[in-house]
Amino acid sequence: MAKHLFTSESVSEGHPDKIADQISDAVLDAILEQDPKARVACETYVKTGMVMVGGEVTTSAWVDIEEITRKTVREIGYTHSDMGFDADSCAILNAIGKQSPDINQGVDRADPKEQGAGDQGLMFGYANNETDVLMPAPITYSHKLVKRQSEVRKDKTLPWLRPDAKSQVTFAYNNDGSIAGIDAVVLSTQHREDVSQADLIEGVMETIIKPVLPAKWLSKDTKYFINPTGRFVIGGPVGDCGLTGRKIIVDTYGGMARHGGGAFSGKDPSKVDRSAAYAARYVAKNIVAAGLADRCEIQVSYAIGVAEPTSISIETFGTAKVAEELLIDLVRRHFDLRPYGLTEMLNLARPIYQATAAYGHFGRNEFPWEATDKAEALRADAGL
């Protein structure tokens, strides 16, 4: 008998908020490619026929904001005016200014290792052992569904798909925390006007849902909701405006872990909202990979202009194999969580961010914060 249900959602790269995230991170990458020490805070707003890019930047680099924006929108798939949003004809407004010298004064140091945090704040990292990437299953499979939607749209397996899509997966859990199965699946996808509802439902079920969701978790009682409104022709920035940083739960753990509130996209690594959240994931994943806990949530916090974290705390939900006080001591000894230290530890001062801006920042092994290279040393130091 399942004790409880838990749901997470994801959105595709063509969702308006994700278009904005990807443009912000594409601008960030272009700047970091020329100037790894740049300070970037890039925000994007998209609506019918227009994109506005704003924020604060301090850099020696020059990048073509208009060309970066058009290229990003084109790669996502908005390439026809009949979609209401066309990479080649949309208006692009550039409202980028310089970063405040007051912030620079707090961050920059004569000794780079003493670089202060770019702002105050609290960040969380999380890992558990219910998937092979040590992520919660609901968000992992929600991402997989919309990623699959993008793949079969772009390779024209389902040529009537359009870029905007959303997924949601509800898992049932047993009393011991193990997965009992999938209770419900929601997949809403934008489509051409000429496809029938019957063809759409069959195509989505056979080409997207069944290849992605493990059969062992599906049953006759699993509920499927495919385009439950019956029509999703108007989508993307025509249907809704999009803004950088509005999908922070999709970007992280799907609600299974707490969130400090800071968004990621468009921010260089001096912004601990982003870099410390990545480092916290790295710490939590290595603790779980080392077998020191089955679930681990770590919180770190910072004061603007101060290098050392103001706090580190760990919650293992009763699954720790050693005392949580020892875990905190291990974290302090094995991980440098100062802004400069974590940037060096994870090699963050380089153009790797646009790829993070759709389908989740965590649980994807191509990113350096997903490595488990500290697990063996942690386990040995813990005496296990």
Swiss-Prot record:
UniProt GO MF annotations: ATP binding; magnesium ion binding; methionine adenosyltransferase activity
Keyword list, A-Z: ATP-binding, Cytoplasm, Magnesium, Metal-binding, Nucleotide-binding, One-carbon metabolism, Potassium, Transferase
Gene3D superfamilies referenced in this protein's UniProt entry, alphabetically: 3.30.300.10
Pathway membership, UniProt: Amino-acid biosynthesis; S-adenosyl-L-methionine biosynthesis; S-adenosyl-L-methionine from L-methionine: step 1/1
Main location: cytoplasm
Signal peptide feature range: none
Binding-site residues, K(+): 43
EC number(s) reported in the record: 2.5.1.6
Spans annotated as Flexible loop: 99-109
Gene Ontology biological-process annotations: one-carbon metabolic process; S-adenosylmethionine biosynthetic process
Cellular compartment(s): Cytoplasm
Highest taxon, organism lineage: Bacteria
Named cofactor requirement(s): Mg(2+); K(+)
Residues involved in Mg(2+) binding: 17
Protein name: S-adenosylmethionine synthase
A Gene Ontology term for the protein's cellular component: cytoplasm
Enzyme class: transferase
Residue numbers binding ATP: 15, 164-166, 231-232, 240, 246-247, 263, 267
Cross-referenced InterPro entries: ADOMET_SYNTHASE_CS, S-AdoMet_synt_C, S-AdoMet_synt_central, S-AdoMet_synt_N, S-AdoMet_synthetase, S-AdoMet_synthetase_sfam
Cofactor note text: Binds 2 divalent ions per subunit.
Reaction equation(s) it catalyzes: L-methionine + ATP + H2O = S-adenosyl-L-methionine + phosphate + diphosphate
